[in-house]
Amino acid sequence: MDKSKINLAVIVPLFFIMLYLLPLGLRDLWSPDELRYAEIAREMVDSGNWIVPTFNDIRYFEKPVMGHWMNAISQVLFGENNFSVRAASAFSTLGAAFCLFLLVGRFANRKQAWVTVSVFLSLFLVSNLGTYSVLDGMLNLWLTAAFTAFFYAADSPTTSQRCRFYGLAGLFCACALLTKGFLALALPVIVVVPFMIWQRQLVDILRWGWWVMLVALIVTLPWALAIHAAEPDYWHYFFWVEHIQRFAAEDAQHTSPAWYYLPYLLLGTLPWLFLAPSAIKHLKGHWQSPLLRYALLWALIPFIFFSAAKGKLVTYILPCMAPLAIILAQGIISAFENRAKGLKIGSVINCAFFSLISVAVIVLFYMGRLPLEAEEFYRPWLLVVVCGSWAVLAYISIKAKSLEGKIASYMLMPLSLFLLAWAIIPNISIDSKMPGRFLEQVSPLVSDDAILIADYPSTMSAFNWYFKRRDVYLTGNTGEVSYGIGYDDAKHKYVAPSLLGEFIRKQSVPVVILFREMDVPQSLPEPDKRIERGKFTLVYYDRVKR
């Protein structure tokens, strides 16, 4: 690739459209996350209640409201479909990339800004969560904006500029808090304070800290008071259960060892992982840059913080990716300017690795070792196309003479995977985590007056979303709606497994039960129909036979 033919200012927007927007509607929604957030937003729009989040008309206090607002607005704009469910995550990622462009473009240069954005948008963890409906992408937008505003404020020479940028930082911290809670306030504090100490500007943050907190309070207070008036115990549950127990208590959710994030960090930095050793090596001499120091603390301290917490999920380290992109971009530029052999070596390893994966997929396919059905014969070949195109781009990057050529080659490597993912996902995954196809198959059995029963909130959300119902009964484990279903006006939605047979016999309308997490109880009456597909089992009772 020749420098005269490569313009990242053109390629990056096209890349965003092709990877982040075009495939959004192609894949069915994943359970439980995407169906849960799709349904909460749908109920918000349908009910007109934008204060109290509900899930199957059950109070849902696990998260604040900003992420649900963003998802709901997306459904208002684009309708109730797969694209709208994921659109807020995609545009949040674009917003975070724009913040990085402003930050690096202002305190480094325009070329480095485009390289940083190229790295960020193509990081495997970023692109995965940017095309998947979870709240972490939206949280990352507000945190990236807050960290950008803090750095602008620290560098501002006048009082009016500092007032403006510290105020913006408070605004973005409030939006982050309204998206995922008090964690949004902790991360800026544990990063910005050490940075200001390093820069010998601690007095500055002490002088302006009150202003940041005041703005955050002003922005947060209207909804905080509204939710307290509507549901007085919201803040008690949200603070103690969702924060203290999730992250620190002995019975914290998702407990994992301290090293849990390390392999995911390596995977999440693909395809740039192959250039990372050379990039890090050539950062020597650049650490006097305040921006690079800031990025180091921004990446390292939250990573240590999340690693030390008892509760862990891969999505938690997403806020570390933006500063990592700043560091990698600076290192790659420096390595290229010094004609480092490490860049070529990394690309050779990259090319060889994905070439070997292509061969391995073909061999495993012909040996019958892939978990595929006969009708899925084409899926391995699509995966070979993905790995082959990745290897070809790695080879092109070796031959590229310009920095822009190398960057564009690496940025485009994940593109074919995301464009073809909808066709590569095997039936074994579809029939376990994507219930849309199964429910479409059984939809003729689900009349408007049928009683729907699910064995877990994940199957409940599938009934909710695909049949536009908010009156689904639960049996078995209540999971994440355990607290909400304990309210007097929601208790009737739970039927204990031991009482399920009696409940069915009392009905005068069809009963449809979806099982995934539990076996069908032997005590149930003989169903009129029983349909199984993968991990999903549906039992149907017609009103005629009682």
UniProtKB/Swiss-Prot annotation:
<keyword id="KW-0448">Lipopolysaccharide biosynthesis</keyword>
<keyword id="KW-0808">Transferase</keyword>
<dbReference type="InterPro" id="IPR022839">
    <property type="entry name" value="ArnT_tfrase"/>
</dbReference>
<comment type="pathway">
    <text>Lipopolysaccharide metabolism; 4-amino-4-deoxy-beta-L-arabinose-lipid A biosynthesis.</text>
</comment>
<dbReference type="GO" id="GO:0006493">
    <property type="term" value="P:protein O-linked glycosylation"/>
</dbReference>
<dbReference type="InterPro" id="IPR050297">
    <property type="entry name" value="LipidA_mod_glycosyltrf_83"/>
</dbReference>
<feature type="transmembrane region" description="Helical">
    <location>
        <begin position="380"/>
        <end position="400"/>
    </location>
</feature>
<feature type="transmembrane region" description="Helical">
    <location>
        <begin position="289"/>
        <end position="309"/>
    </location>
</feature>
<dbReference type="GO" id="GO:0010041">
    <property type="term" value="P:response to iron(III) ion"/>
</dbReference>
<dbReference type="GO" id="GO:0103015">
    <property type="term" value="F:4-amino-4-deoxy-L-arabinose transferase activity"/>
</dbReference>
<keyword id="KW-0472">Membrane</keyword>
<feature type="transmembrane region" description="Helical">
    <location>
        <begin position="345"/>
        <end position="365"/>
    </location>
</feature>
<feature type="transmembrane region" description="Helical">
    <location>
        <begin position="450"/>
        <end position="467"/>
    </location>
</feature>
<keyword id="KW-0443">Lipid metabolism</keyword>
<dbReference type="Pfam" id="PF02366">
    <property type="entry name" value="PMT"/>
</dbReference>
<keyword id="KW-0444">Lipid biosynthesis</keyword>
<feature type="transmembrane region" description="Helical">
    <location>
        <begin position="177"/>
        <end position="197"/>
    </location>
</feature>
<feature type="transmembrane region" description="Helical">
    <location>
        <begin position="313"/>
        <end position="333"/>
    </location>
</feature>
<keyword id="KW-1003">Cell membrane</keyword>
<dbReference type="GO" id="GO:0009103">
    <property type="term" value="P:lipopolysaccharide biosynthetic process"/>
</dbReference>
<protein>
    <recommendedName>
        <fullName>Undecaprenyl phosphate-alpha-4-amino-4-deoxy-L-arabinose arabinosyl transferase</fullName>
        <ecNumber>2.4.2.43</ecNumber>
    </recommendedName>
</protein>
<feature type="transmembrane region" description="Helical">
    <location>
        <begin position="87"/>
        <end position="107"/>
    </location>
</feature>
<feature type="transmembrane region" description="Helical">
    <location>
        <begin position="113"/>
        <end position="133"/>
    </location>
</feature>
<feature type="transmembrane region" description="Helical">
    <location>
        <begin position="410"/>
        <end position="430"/>
    </location>
</feature>
<keyword id="KW-0812">Transmembrane</keyword>
<dbReference type="InterPro" id="IPR003342">
    <property type="entry name" value="Glyco_trans_39/83"/>
</dbReference>
<comment type="similarity">
    <text>Belongs to the glycosyltransferase 83 family.</text>
</comment>
<keyword id="KW-0441">Lipid A biosynthesis</keyword>
<feature type="transmembrane region" description="Helical">
    <location>
        <begin position="6"/>
        <end position="26"/>
    </location>
</feature>
<keyword id="KW-1133">Transmembrane helix</keyword>
<feature type="transmembrane region" description="Helical">
    <location>
        <begin position="208"/>
        <end position="228"/>
    </location>
</feature>
<dbReference type="GO" id="GO:0005886">
    <property type="term" value="C:plasma membrane"/>
</dbReference>
<dbReference type="GO" id="GO:0000030">
    <property type="term" value="F:mannosyltransferase activity"/>
</dbReference>
<comment type="function">
    <text>Catalyzes the transfer of the L-Ara4N moiety of the glycolipid undecaprenyl phosphate-alpha-L-Ara4N to lipid A. The modified arabinose is attached to lipid A and is required for resistance to polymyxin and cationic antimicrobial peptides.</text>
</comment>
<keyword id="KW-0328">Glycosyltransferase</keyword>
<feature type="transmembrane region" description="Helical">
    <location>
        <begin position="260"/>
        <end position="280"/>
    </location>
</feature>
<dbReference type="GO" id="GO:0009245">
    <property type="term" value="P:lipid A biosynthetic process"/>
</dbReference>
<keyword id="KW-0997">Cell inner membrane</keyword>
